[in-house]
Amino acid sequence: MDGSFVQHSVRVLQELNKQREKGQYCDATLDVGGLVFKAHWSVLACCSHFFQSLYGDGSGGSVVLPAGFAEIFGLLLDFFYTGHLALTSGNRDQVLLAARELRVPEAVELCQSFKPKISVGQAAGGQSGQGPPASQNVNSHVKEPAGLEEEEVSRTLGLVPRDQEPRGSHSPQRPKLHSLAQSESPSSLCGKLKQASKPCPPEDKKLEDCKVLPRPFEAEGAQLQGGSNEWEVVVQVEDDGDGDYMSEPEAVLTRRKSNVIRKPCAAEPALNAGSLAAEPAENRKGTAVPVECPTCHKKFLSKYYLKVHNRKHTGEKPFECPKCGKCYFRKENLLEHEARNCMNRSEQVFTCSVCQETFRRRMELRVHMVSHTGEMPYKCSSCSQQFMQKKDLQSHMIKLHGAPKPHACPTCAKCFLSRTELQLHEAFKHRGEKLFVCEECGHRASSRNGLQMHIKAKHRNERPHVCEFCSHAFTQKANLNMHLRTHTGEKPFQCHLCGKTFRTQASLDKHNRTHTGERPFSCEFCEQRFTEKGPLLRHVASRHQEGRPHFCQICGKTFKAVEQLRVHVRRHKGVRKFECTECGYKFTRQAHLRRHMEIHDRVENYNPRQRKLRNLIIEDEKMVVVALQPPAELEVGSAEVIVESLAQGGLASQLPGQRLCAEESFTGPGVLEPSLIITAAVPEDCDT
């Protein structure tokens, strides 16, 4: 053992425990029934599979645990840091329950091997004075395999976790059920369980006085429905994940837990044999048939958990707090929120220490304090910018100073600001999933924001944000702000390597590929790769596709790529934002304007000849959509009249139903004046 210190690991754990007791370097906050515990995420993740799955990457945060764990959670936390678990006959059941639901296998093993002072015979005799001991019913006839029946009943009663508990374990507070479950059929089993159960005390005794362990994460279906006097006992730990989500092997091997029906009474409820016998045979005997999410193909034990999971795809939060208006995916999350004294928090006020002014929110007080101090809490270390929130400072450091984004994709190494953006990127880019589906037309979007934009633009025709310079309308204000930069010349995104600035983050990302040499877009027909998607589409259209299949339905010009057609149609909409300062000639692309300016430099008094149909502007939005459709989809109507008339070269006499600008005239069939405007009426039954 040269060069090693045997007690090093013990000393490190002791120091961590001292830090926990002093609250030093603790990055985890655990709220258990109003009691707050500080701990280290690394220690929690090492000892509990629950915490490891909840925050697998070790990021900080706070977790709210069931109030029923308040009395014994301190014992488990001490066990995490010291390895010692203070068990007694009084707290053994609660510690075992918490250890199972938090998935602490070492604590579960200690609880199962714990020997209480009260014998099993005395405990069984105190609970019921009737019937023979459960161990005597070994030779009874069996209708199903004993091990499977034992697993179902024990798991439903909260005695065994999903992976079957060792048979030697028992609880001093409850009747022993293992051999009973092995030897009896479902109907006779329920009868003996009723005999072994503790009888109900008088009705004036409160339910809180009974030894009924609380179920912190009960499913919504476990609540009373329509005044019924029965409910389903669902014993299941449900974290922030997808409830009863099962992996592929587990979906095959796991059996459905028994649907034991319980009747409410003032004490420990007894099992109802009649209700159990009335169940369908497939629920009592058959194996569980997992239900699958049609969007992401995850599997669940029940339709309820699938219903809750689907809300993540739709964004629905049906459970709203009546006091503060906060919404949740699941009802149990709302109940936990209400249990944390929502009303008391909403009535809390924050007072300024300087002028004694009161505020309802802490953020409002922070904003107010800036008027006294003149300084915001978060300052940029590279420039003089200040921010009220940490996330704003983080975004500023990434956009302007080249700080790395915290969440990297393990497949392509692309980084994101939030974990949600990373998950959506992996689903869309690497698995080809578009998880958000429009209920009206079936359109699929890769993000919830994209789906909302689709609904507003296509089904609601909502474009409330209008540009004050060119009257172009947008569905979102962020898109308008991005568009305004084309008029103001603002370029807030700067490359931290060469200092070049850009209008959008996407443009900066494309530019960064010139430094890194990355070419993420590859051609499926050859080995050529590209830095952008547009050049890839043009390459495929020009090199690997024959003919020019895409043509404009207004002027008849043909194109190889549909992107080229879309750019061309903008000319018919009048979108020419690059204007020559010498002659006023306008272009759709800046490269065309630069090429035109070179002609002015070489030729004096250059006056470009107006090309036919160059400035034909269609005011009707539907006509632009018609222009992008293939000819087979067009119906006989004014749109075809326009195309035919343009081909013949005489517009005024052929379009009696159209409106021509009064100031325009034709000098000949080969030349068209610059500002001919057509407002077309598309038939209502045209599918646009």
Swiss-Prot record:
Please list the residues that bind Zn(2+) 1. Answer: C293, C296, H309, H313
The UniProt annotation places Zn(2+) 3 binding at C352, C355, H368, H372
Q: Which residues carry this modification: Phosphoserine?
A: S169, S171, S179
Zn-finger (CCHC-type) intervals are: 319-344
| Pfam families for this protein | BTB, zf-C2H2
- Per the record, the major location class is nucleus
Function of the molecule: Plays a critical role in transcriptional regulation and chromatin remodeling. Acts as a regulator of telomere length. Directly binds the telomeric double-stranded 5'-TTAGGG-3' repeat. Preferentially binds to telomeres that have a low concentration of shelterin complex and acts as a regulator of telomere length by initiating telomere trimming, a process that prevents the accumulation of aberrantly long telomeres. Also acts as a transcription regulator that binds to promoter regions. Regulates expression of a small subset of genes, including MTFP1.
The domain section of the record reads: The C2H2-type zinc fingers mediate binding to the telomeric double-stranded 5'-TTAGGG-3' repeats. The last C2H2-type zinc finger is required for telomeric-binding. The two last C2H2-type zinc fingers are required for CIITA promoter III binding.
A GO biological process of this protein is:
regulation of immune system process
- Residues in BTB domain copies: 26-89
What is the recorded name of this protein?
Answer: Zinc finger and BTB domain-containing protein 48
Which UniProt keyword terms apply here?
Answer: Activator, Chromosome, DNA-binding, Isopeptide bond, Metal-binding, Nucleus, Phosphoprotein, Repeat, Telomere, Transcription, Transcription regulation, Ubl conjugation, Zinc, Zinc-finger
Residues noted as binding Zn(2+) 2 in the record, renumbered to the chain: C321, C324, H337, C342
- Cross-linked sites for Glycyl lysine isopeptide (Lys-Gly) (interchain with G-Cter in SUMO2): K143, K263
- GO cellular component terms, semicolon-separated: chromosome, telomeric region; nucleoplasm
Could you say which protein family the record assigns here?
A: Belongs to the krueppel C2H2-type zinc-finger protein family.
State the PANTHER family in the record: GASTRULA ZINC FINGER PROTEIN XLCGF26.1-LIKE-RELATED, ZINC FINGER AND BTB DOMAIN-CONTAINING
Whose protein is this, by species? Pongo abelii
**Where in or outside the cell is it found?**
Nucleus; Chromosome, Telomere
Binding residues annotated for Zn(2+) 5, in chain numbering? C552, C555, H568, H596
Cite the residue spans of the region called Disordered.
Answer: 159-205
